[in-house]
Amino acid sequence: MIYLFILFALIAGMALPTQFSINAQLRSLVGSPILASTISFIVGSIALLILSLFQQGVRFNKGWLEGPWWIFTGGLLGAFYVVATIVLIPRIGAASTVAFILTGQIIASVLIDHFGLFGVQIQSINLYKFIGVSLIIIGVIFVQKH
């Protein structure tokens, strides 16, 4: 079963640079990274709304409003992420954009795990994680070399 999750993660990972490149072309068509991001989010939101309508047992609950304020900021971070990729792809290319984003994701993930931020179970930084992050950063440097 774990292999299916790994495959799912790999496919999701491959979807991101594809989305980035498609959104960069959309920006060229509409002339604005913000408008391209808006269109991308509207299309994605419609797809999610349709999926939500068919999901069993999930309904609006006013208890949702009792969570911490930051729990609803994921969409803002997603919007920043999409705009950033639309701006970066034409300037530094897909490989460099993904390499730098991946580096940022790994660094943030290790810090979130280490400090238990956002309710994540604490997983301290160890030598293996440090070496792994270092190798990713070295890989980004190699991706940048022409």
Predicted features and spans:
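Juxtamembrane boundary at the C-terminal end of a transmembrane helix
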Residues: 114, 143-146
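Hydrophobic/aromatic residues within transmembrane alpha-helices
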Residues: 36, 88, 115-117
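Structural motif at transmembrane-helix junctions in multi-pass transporters
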Residues: 28-32, 84-100
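Membrane-interface interhelical linkers
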Residues: 1-11, 18, 25-28, 34, ...
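C-terminal transmembrane-helix exit sites in multi-pass transporters
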Residues: 107-127
